[in-house]
Amino acid sequence: MTDIFERIEKHSGGPLGQYAAKAFGYYMFPKLEGELGPHMKFQGKDVLVWSLNNYLGLANHPEVRKADAEAAAKWGLAYPMGSRMMTGHTDLHERFERELADFERKEDAFLFNFGYQGILSTIDALMDRHDVIVYDSEAHACLIDGARMHMGKRMTYRHNDYESCEKTLQRATRLCEETGGGILLITEGVYGMTGALGFLDKIVELKKRYK
């Protein structure tokens, strides 16, 4: 039997491996230098950073840093020692949710650990097995995975293609006439992986015609 490491070395030129050398240090494991924020250094050059969840530099604001330091001093850096669903749920989560709900003038609020989880849960909460999901073929992975979890039908249309989207909506409409369900049409305002702009104005127009 071939040694597992020999197999890895042998197949390192596969679909992903062949790009590893070119991607390393750029697309993969890019090394940013300087204070975390919207402006940092990459390979010796000043760059505008969009790959951190700190686009506007709010994490560097003096008040935010002060709150971080006070929380670490009071509860320690390791608190709350567990995911929220298990043993990590605290009164701080609940207080923050109440403050968010009050700020937004809503009945309640719920915090997710990350956006991916929020999107999956939203799609699941909106749909039942009689409904149809229609989504862009290059939608973000969280949208695609949310659609895949759907127990009913799901259909894709070609990326940012108005005609393909309309034809798919026509198919979905015929199906919903049989099931009595509705249609969830998914696109993006800005596609995060490419920067392409979604045709939101046309999407709204189509959705008014295909309910």
Indicate where each model-derived feature is located.
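Short, small-residue-enriched loops and turns at beta-alpha junctions
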Residues: 57-58, 85-89, 141, 162-163, ...
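N-terminal "arm"/small-domain region of PLP-dependent enzymes with the aminotransferase-like
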Residues: 12-78
